Design a protein with these regions (language model features):
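Class II aminoacyl-tRNA synthetase catalytic cores and aaRS-like
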Residues: 1-421
Length: 421
C-alpha cells in the first residue's frame, strides 16, 4: 500500500471498535470485479483511520446467529446481542410491518389515538400491575392489560375508526413465552358487523405477507373458518395448526375460529374474575350473536349463549382476537349480573362504561393482534424474545437493567407504603 502508517494502525484494531475511515473510491479493474457483491465494482483506498472509541472484549460472540449462546448472557448484554445481523433484521422488519399497518389503516380512514397508561384496575383476565399514587396515598393506578374500555369509549365519542400500536401489561405467573409487557395492534370500528372487522383484518394480513414477506406462501385464501365446537372436537384445541407441511418454513396457514361460548362455569376457568357461578370466556364486553340476545337479557340457558367473538390463528398460534361489543348498557349489565356482580360493584367498576353506552353509542366492534407473536412467526423465530428489542425473561426480569429492584426508604415513605417481611 502507498499508506504504510494506515497499515500499522490497522494492526491494532480489535472487534467492535468504532472507526472513522477516510479514503478514495476507485473503480476495480475488470478482472477484480465481484459480480454478486454490493459495490463489487469499486474498492476503497484507505488514506486514514481514526479510532473514535475502543471496545472492551465482547462478552458474547455477535458474528453468529446467537442461538447457541445462553439466553441469560444474551439478555444481560442485549446492546451487544442486537448487533448480530439476524437481530438487526428482526428489529428492522418489525419497524417495516408497523409502518405498513399505520399507512394501510390511515388510507382506510382510521385515526391513531394514544390511550392512558395510568388507568384503573378492572377485571380483564389477568392480574394488573399496580402503581401507587403519592398524592392520593392508599389509592392505586393500574397499568392497562389492553385499551379495551378506552377504545369503546372512543366509539361513544364519535371517533368511528380507531387504532393504536399499544403497549399492554399483564402480571402473569412465570410462563416461558409470555412477556409482562407486550405490543398489540388494537383497533375498533363503529357501525360494523362481524364480517366487516374480519374482512379488514384478513386483507391487512394478506397484504403484509405479500408486500413484506414475498417468499412466504399463505396456504389458503380466503382464510378457512371453523367453529370453536368443531375445533375442539376434531383437533382438541381452539388453535389448530392447518399447515399441510409443517417442515416448510415459508408456509403460513391462517384460520378463523368463530362461534365461541360466551360464558363458562367458574370452576372450569383458568382465570375466573368472579365468585359467581359463571365467568366470561374471552371478554365481558362482547355481544352475543343476534339469536342469543334474548337468552342473555333473560339470563336463561347461559351455557349455550354464543358470542360474536372471532380469533385469528396462524400455524397453531393465536395471533388475534376480537368481537362485536354490547353497545346497549342493559345488555352489558346483564353480563356482569350473570357473573354474580352485585349492582354496587357494577356501578363502581363499570359505571363510566354503562353511562357512555347509554349516551347514544353506535354499534361497534374490533380486534387486537398479539403483534410480537405475529412477528415471531413471520421471522421464523423460536420465541417472541427474538423479535423484541429489550425483552424480559419468563420470570419477568430485565437482566440488563437489573429490574425489578428495591426502592429507597424515602420513596416508600412518600408513597405511604410499609413492606411486610
Amino acid at each position: 500500500t502507498s499508506h504504510p502508517e494506515v497499515t500499522e494502525k490497522a494492526k491494532e484494531i480489535r472487534p467492535e471498535w468504532v472507526l472513522k475511515v477516510t479514503g478514495i473510491v476507485n473503480k476495480r479493474p475488470d478482472k477484480n470485479v465481484k459480480q454478486d457483491t454490493l459495490n463489487g465494482d469499486v474498492e476503497l483506498e484507505v488514506t486514514n483511520i481514526e479510532i473514535l472509541n475502543k471496545a472492551e472484549t465482547s462478552p458474547i460472540d455477535v458474528t453468529t446467529e446467537g442461538y447457541e449462546i445462553g439466553e441469560e448472557h444474551r439478555l444481560k448484554y442485549r446492546y451487544f446481542d442486537l448487533r448480530r445481523s439476524r437481530m438487526q433484521k428482526n428489529i428492522r422488519n418489525r419497524h417495516k410491518v408497523v409502518k405498513f399497518i399505520r399507512d394501510y389503516l390511515d388510507k382506510e380512514n382510521f385515526i391513531e389515538v394514544e390511550t392512558p397508561i395510568l388507568t384503573k384496575s378492572t377485571p380483564e383476565g389477568a392480574r394488573d400491575y399496580i402503581v401507587p399514587s403519592r398524592l392520593w396515598q392508599g389509592t392505586f393506578y393500574a397499568l392497562p392489560q389492553s385499551p379495551q374500555q378506552y377504545k369503546q369509549l372512543l366509539m361513544a365519542a364519535g371517533t368511528e375508526k380507531y387504532f393504536q400500536i399499544a403497549r399492554c401489561m399483564r402480571d402473569e405467573d412465570t410462563r416461558g413465552d409470555r412477556q409482562p409487557e407486550f405490543t398489540q395492534l388494537d383497533l375498533e370500528m363503529s357501525f360494523v358487523e362481524r364480517e366487516d372487522v374480519m374482512a379488514l383484518n384478513e386483507t391487512l394480513l394478506i397484504d403484509i405477507v405479500k408486500k413484506l414477506y414475498p417468499g412466504k406462501k399463505i396456504q389458503e385464501i380466503p382464510f378457512p373458518r371453523i367453529s370453536y365446537k368443531e375445533a375442539m372436537e376434531k383437533y382438541g384445541t381452539d388453535r389448530p395448526d392447518f399447515r399441510k407441511n409443517k417442515e416448510d418454513k415459508n408456509s403460513l396457514a391462517f384460520c378463523w375460529i368463530v362461534d365461541f361460548p360466551f360464558f363458562e362455569r367458574t370452576d372450569k376457568s383458568d382465570n375466573a374474575q368472579t365468585e359467581g357461578e359463571w365467568t366470561f370466556t374471552h371478554n365481558p364486553f362482547s355481544r352475543p350473536q343476534n339469536e342469543y340476545i334474548e337468552m342473555l337479557m333473560n339470563k336463561k340457558d347461559i351455557g349455550n349463549i354464543l358470542t360474536t367473538q372471532y380469533d385469528v390463528v396462524l400455524n397453531g398460534s393465536e395471533i388475534g382476537g376480537g368481537s362485536i361489543r354490547n353497545h346497549e348498557p342493559e345488555a352489558l349489565k346483564k353480563v356482569f349480573e350473570i357473573m354474580g356482580y352485585p349492582s354496587e360493584r357494577i356501578e363502581k367498576n363499570f359505571g363510566h362504561m354503562l353511562h357512555a353506552l347509554g349516551s347514544g353509542c353506535p354499534p361497534h366492534g374490533g380486534i387486537a393482534w398479539g403483534f410480537d407473536r405475529l412477528m415471531m412467526l413471520l421471522e421464523n423465530e423460536p420465541n417472541i424474545r427474538e423479535v423484541i428489542a429489550f425483552p424480559k425473561t419468563g420470570e419477568g426480569k430485565d437482566l440488563m437493567m437489573g429490574s425489578p429492584a428495591p426502592i429507597t426508604d424515602k420513596q416508600l415513605k412518600e408513597l405511604g407504603i410499609k413492606l411486610v417481611k
